[in-house]
Amino acid sequence: VKINANIGTSPHDISLEKEQAKLAAALEYGADAVMDLSTGGYWVEIRTALLGQCPAPFGTDTIYQVMTEATSLDDVKADDLLDMVHHHAKQGVDFVTVHCGVTRAALPLLAKRVTGVVSRGGAFLTAWMRRYGQENPLYEHYDRLLEIAREYDVTLSLGDGLRPGCLADATDKAQLHELKVLGELTRRAWAKGVQIIVEGPGHLPLNAIQKNVRLQQKHCSGAPFYVLGPLVTDVASGYDHIAGAIGGALAATLGAAFLCYV
């Protein structure tokens, strides 16, 4: 089992020195990979500096930069999402999160959710699809993503844009619809020689973790499962690191390959 540590700026706290300190701490305490999830600042300069100092695999979520640089949905075209993946790959990152499994077919399945879409990337893409009446460009033009990934030897981390944000939404139709799409995309990537990680929930009750790991292994043909937690309770605000450690420990024993600390 491998551990990923997230670092990154916010619009109100932009400091290369702070990010370098976070990176050093993550590596000191044994992180196997690091993701820069910055949402503000001088992107290229910070990412270049961190890449130069990080011996571990280094990942990004490209849609964060698209979202932050745009002033509204009207500013974001399909090519912008694909071009940003190319930009990050060309800069030298090892893996990128891409929310390719959020499709128009899943939108009606969200109606009865308690907490809706809690993933930043997922929320952005659902809003984009509703605004334009078009399919998710990362799904529609997936072959272009595969070409980029193969050219730059980048692993695609297929994001769980419809992950449940509370226990009541766990393993619902929207989550499972996305998981099945990610399985299809996994096999298409393998056929093109592209490596894949499949991201997973999210908020899950303790007794649903085994089922979710088994479902991922089934639908995604055993691709490495990268889980955010899972968080096993909704009533531990401020203590997500504890709830996530409990869920992550169980998920790891059941076959999850990659844990994202929270």
What are these model-derived regions, one by one?
Residues 1-233, 239, 244-259:
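Alpha/beta enzyme core
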